[in-house]
C-alpha cells in the first residue's frame, strides 16, 4: 500500500512539473469578443510562479458611430442629442495580477485584481433652435434651427477584480474565458464647441441651456459660454462590468 501511494505521489509530481513547463512562461493574446466590436486589444501575460502571473493589456477603438445607442440613451437623456451621429473612440491600458487556483502555471480558475486607465474620445451632436432678437418691438422672429458638435475627451482611472478560467488547448494555444467582474473609479474631461464666425451670442446661450438639460446622473456637467463657443466640463464616478470575454492566446 505504501508503495502504491509513493508511486501515485511521484506520478502526480511528474504531471504537475510537466504541465508547468508546457508552452513557456509567456502568453500573447487577444479578446475575440472585443475584436468583434472593433475594439482591438492585445495582452501580454507572464508567469511568476505556479500560482501567480502578471499581465499588461492595451486596447484601441478608432472613433466611430456609437455601437450601443439604446444603452447609451438610458444613461444620457436629452432629446436634443442626435445619437445617430454620436461618435466615440477609446484607448485603455490595464495592469493586472492573476492568482490561479489550479496546479498548472497560468491554467485553471483564477481571480484577478486590476487597475485601468482609459481615455474616451467623443463627438456629441446637438440640434436646437434659437430666436433672434427682433428689431421691431412686440414682434417675434421665427426660431432658427441650429446644429453644434461638442468634441473632447473623458479620462478615467478605476480599480477592480474579476474571475475567469484559462485552458491549455494545445502546446502553444491558450483559451481564456472571462466570467464576471467589475471596476470602479473616477472620471473627468472636457468637451468644447467652437462656433463659426458670426454666431450670435443668443445662439450660444441657447446652446448652453440645451446642454444644461442633459441628465447624466451620477455624472455632473458644468457648461459655460466663451467669446466663440461653449465649454462643458464633466466629472463623476466611473464603473464598468468585465466579463463574458473569449480570449485566444499564443504561449511561448
Report the location of each language-model feature.
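Extracellular/periplasm-exposed beta-strand and loop segments of Gram-negative cell-envelope proteins
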Residues: 30-33, 63-92, 120-156, 184-243
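Repeated loop/turn-to-beta-strand initiation elements of outer-membrane beta-barrel proteins
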Residues: 51-54, 105-106, 171-175
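Short N-terminal segments immediately surrounding and downstream of signal-peptide cleavage
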Residues: 20-36
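Ordered, amphipathic secondary-structure segments that act as subunit-interaction surfaces
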Residues: 101-123
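Bacterial Sec-dependent N-terminal signal peptides
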Residues: 1-24, 248, 252
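Membrane-embedded beta-strand positions of outer-membrane beta-barrel proteins
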Residues: 28-32, 44, 54-57, 95-97, ...
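Feature captures outer-membrane beta-barrel proteins of Gram-negative bacteria and organelles
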Residues: 19-21, 40-55, 59, 98
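Outer-membrane beta-barrel "beta-signal"
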Residues: 98, 238-252
